[in-house]
Amino acid sequence: MLTLEELKKNTDLINEIEWNMTPEEAVKQYLEWGNTDWGSGKYVIRSKSDYTTYFVVNCWRKPYFIYLIRRNSQEAQELAKFELPSRFEKDVCELKGVYALEEEVKAWLKQELGV
């Protein structure tokens, strides 16, 4: 699993990131009934070779971590893991759970990754 410093050097992987993907939307598109919208003009997931790459924040226990996830219709792989900066903890991890990136965290992460 990559660290933040290792991820910074992996331009191809950074370019795959879907910054607006959420954990809920990924499950909907790749695992559940939400992948049947043929008439909408949206891309429909057709096979396990289709995947999305996105970030989540895991707030179940300290230290809190940001994970880069690659999900297809069969599995979710953790590609990178690094600690959530403490300045974001209060706003992001008020409740236990796994969350999409909030805008401030997303802006910080984009700056860190040179996006």
Language model segments and positions:
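Ubiquitous "structural anchor" signal
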Residues: 6-7, 47, 105
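Acidic, low-complexity, intrinsically disordered interaction modules
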Residues: 21, 25-100
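Charge-rich, solvent-exposed alpha-helical interaction surfaces
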Residues: 10-16, 26-30, 78, 91, ...
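N-terminal trafficking/processing presequences and adjacent post-cleavage segments
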Residues: 1-22
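Short, aromatic- and cysteine-enriched interfacial helices/patches
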Residues: 1-2, 112-115
